[in-house]
Amino acid sequence: MRNMSFMITPDQIRAKTKTVTRRMGWKNLKPGTLLQPVVKGQGLKKGEQVEKIGGPIRVLSVDRVILNQITPQDVYREGFPQMTQREFVTMFKKSHRGCRAGSAVNRIQFEYAEEA
């Protein structure tokens, strides 16, 4: 099972309030795939270990979407109910080098596998 990092949203994953994630990569991901959420998957210092966040998640869908076309509902599903669409896009761009508001990203919808 592959790991997927949720470094920005570990609390939302722990609380199971996040059901959608946008990624620059992961374009070959298929519905039904099980993934293990982790806090950080890359850039670990010597001696650091991957920290799992709960149990696995199951991918429900993967769609190519334009970042700045995010809906208020998806901002909520991303785990940021307090943010506006513009605030989410700004935050996403800052955390993903080279990403622009009009960039195509992968929208991954998932469920928590132990509840499925």
Segment roles from a protein language model:
Residues 1-116:
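Structured alpha/beta reader/binder surfaces that contact nucleic acids or chromatin modification marks
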